[in-house]
Amino acid sequence: MATQQAKILCCGDVNGNFVELIKKISTTEKKNGPFDSLFCVGEFFGDDDDSNEKVINGNIEFPIPTYILGPANPRYSYLYPEESIEFSSNLTYLGKKGLLNTASGLQIAYLSGVEGSSKDLSCFDKADVEELLIPLGTQVGFSGTDILLTSVWPADIARHSHNQPSKPQPGSVLLSKLAAHLKPRYHFAGLGVHYERQPYRNHRVLLEPARHTTRFIGLAAIGNPEKQKWLYACNVKPMRKMEKEELTAQPPNASEFPYRELLEEIAAKETLSRMNGNGQRPEGSQYRFEMGGAEDGAGNGRKRHNDGGNDGPRNKQPVGPCWFCLSNVDAEKHLVVAIGNKCYAAMPKGPLTEDHVMVLSVGHIQSQVSAPVEVRDEIEKFKSAFTLMANKQGKALVTFERNFRTQHLQVQMVMIDKSSSKALKSSFTTAAACAGFELVTMGPDESLLDMVNEGCPYFVAELPDGSKLFTRSMKGFPLHFGREVLASTPILDCEDKVDWKACVLAKEKEVELVNKLKSDFKPFDFTAEDDSD
């Protein structure tokens, strides 16, 4: 069905030509819209400081939700923060690297910059590529992403293709490896000429099960003298909404996989470099190249993923797959209180109170803003159920979500004495002011989707009276802000529990509290009704 498709635009290097971009997008939107979003690959800002400043300050408005990558030239790095940010209501900087799960169901991977060893925001290296792949290694049955956005081209992209680019383009070997693992259905890149490669296969004919094909589209820069194409429109049906037969249908002009020879050569060289002095491979090593990567979603034991780009020294990244995916074999399932169709409730590690729960998505989704409507609806059902449970105990429910330096949707739900409710709003706003940012009160008819774009960090708290406090000013945002406010003297008076690591319980105690939570929640547990249907 057409409604299952996302209608998107993608453009090449803008290079500061904002007026021309907006004019073209406005015309295209009127003639062929509405479009869900515009993605810009390549260099976005230009040399006109005045225009750049107007865009950053929101004085130049974009007609549809627009998402941009980071710099590919170090001269523009100063214009970008370290984390993703919403420059204006319709302009979002995605960050250096990450995954964007859209409300329409698309999974979009992105990596900014050029391959290099510099630590500047304009460069990426092997560690960046590995970190981007980490959350995908935990997805059971992972078969690919819908879209991959990169600033530059992958190396050897034109190999085995009948049509060739008008000019040879330098490519990144690391991006070739990334594309081989991600298997995107569409791969858009900038910093080059216009080139729509014939689709390539992601499997070996007769040797491997059929997989979907990949379409690589290189886009030229706005205002290029050759007047090459710099804007591309397409309808993309999310992979997760497609039957296997539809997904793996092979176009008649599909070519062989372009990166095989390159990656086999690299793998062979890496194996040789690991050999010891007598020409033998080190014990336990094995030479193997798999085009598909971890098809069954086995964990790879690498560092945890962070969507926001640089986040301090890399050796400080937590190790392992996503802690909150139920499909993760290492998930602490003894903490689970109830499991719905799209979400589940669990007691967090180091709870603030004995009835502190969090509601998380069953699938790997980053935030409420990027969640499909059925996930958001089930979060509300859990919220209503835990509110009833709190009322029965003479308590009130406070909820908050921090979509900042997190990789999995989690809404914290904490019960407090009703007598403490009056101090909540002032406690939140005072703590925010002390931390250097402002919490705004959302209007009664405003939703999170009205306040922030997908992929942008934010914090939101909902008070027992239904009012919501919100910020997207995340510079210097305290990671324990929500817990800090609730643990303060006027509310729960347990300031020793601000950091969850300082109050982790023994497993036996966790099991005891979870069993009590299940018992208390049972009269309000709508998931039990779902199971009986």
UniProtKB/Swiss-Prot annotation:
A GO-annotated cellular component: post-mRNA release spliceosomal complex
Family in the record: Belongs to the CWF19 family.
Chain intervals for the UniProt region annotation (Disordered): 290-314
Organism of origin: Caenorhabditis elegans
GO molecular function: RNA lariat debranching enzyme activator activity
Disulfide bonds: none
UniProt-listed PANTHER family: CWF19, CELL CYCLE CONTROL PROTEIN, CWF19-LIKE PROTEIN 1
Name by which UniProt lists this protein: CWF19-like protein 1 homolog
UniProt GO BP: mRNA splicing, via spliceosome
UniProt-listed InterPro entries: Cwf19-like, Cwf19-like_C_dom-1, Cwf19-like_C_dom-2, HIT-like_sf
